[in-house]
Amino acid sequence: MLQIIPGLEVNPTARAAIEIAAALGAAGARALVACAGGRMEGELQAKGGVFVPFPSRTKSPLAMALNVRRLARLIAAENADIVHVRSRALAWVAYGATRLTKTPFVTTFPSGYQGSNPTALRYNSGLARGDAVLADSNFTAALIAKLHFPAAGKIRVVHQGVDRQVFTPDAVAPARVQAARRHWKVAPHERIVLLAARTRPGSGHKILIEAAGLLSRSGLAGVKFILACDRDEDSALERGIDRAIAAEGLQGIMCRTGPCDMPAALLAASIVVVPATEARAFGDAAVQAQAMGTPVIAANLGAAPETVLAPPMVEESSRTGFLVPPGDAAALALAIATVLSLGATASGKLSSRAKKHVETCFSAEHMCAATLEAYADVRRGGER
């Protein structure tokens, strides 16, 4: 079994590839991962995967054409039964190589690749050419079927999995939580509202800033708002966030910081907010926070209703978090105030339901089992 990904840097794509490699190894299969390498090579090999160096980051047409032949030779040399790819450029390379070798071809279609013009749609369509097309949510599956209709009959929903050995309260030492609070300069009596997201349009930073301003003016005290952002993104967006914080007069209660120890940050938080204004197919932060038992408030768009259960989609007794209209700072402020006012019993029940929801629907084990089932069906010819 051969997976091909851009690299083994620390990101959800590499994490998923490693989890699948481990599951394949446990099932007695040889799990190859071809890519440009990265910091997670050691973890891949420790979990039974085999790293195969491959120039997978190139996107130039000539280099991609050369990679088709290179990948076909690798497939033949390793006698790979199935090829699984997770990016657009690599999808075209793998499509060409697997047609040459007559090898089954599986793709995972990331949700962000919607395409806004014919050229983009054509480029993205490589991911829709798999013998099985894996979508990370029902939202993504519907989007693929709409934009790439020929793929509709080959789509399977395989939700991303959370590593519950990492994202569980028992795995986080109290010292890690205290270190996060010290880094953010949070006083012992203060509670934390955390937004952990990339600094990019659509992440909703300014919606939270506006909501925090409303809460501050209404007299809310004893709360610190933390924006944990990647610092390697658009600096103009970062400056815009800083200006918005200053305009609301929130410098004393809102802190923008860089990447953090995410499990510790989620456990330190009293609330995790995901106020996105653009639809995302799978919200890592929302699911990871629920795994930690931390209350989540998310914008009700994209796949949020799949990952965060809230009325009217479920009964109040089945709630695992809160959904608010996207772009509505007043609704977000009200939800934050509501969660902060929950008593210990209500908060404990919400936390237990959220953790159970993740265990049932979004575990790495669940993701791996569904993916291996897709491999088995494709190998039997069930998807071809």
Predicted segment positions?
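Conserved acidic donor-binding segment of nucleotide-sugar-dependent glycosyltransferases
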Residues: 309-329, 339-344
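Acidic donor-binding loop of glycosyltransferase active sites
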Residues: 267-281, 294
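A conserved mid-protein helix/loop that constitutes part of the nucleotide-sugar donor-binding site
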Residues: 11-22, 191, 200-214, 330
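A short, active-site helix/loop in glycosyltransferases that binds the activated sugar's phosphate group
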Residues: 130-157, 162-166
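A conserved, positively charged/aromatic
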Residues: 99, 105-135, 142
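Short hydrophobic beta-strand element within catalytic cores of glycosyltransferases
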Residues: 295-298, 305-308, 315
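Nucleotide-activated donor-binding/catalytic signature segment of Leloir-type glycosyltransferases, i.e.
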Residues: 238-258
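Short His-centered aromatic/hydrophobic patch
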Residues: 85-91, 109
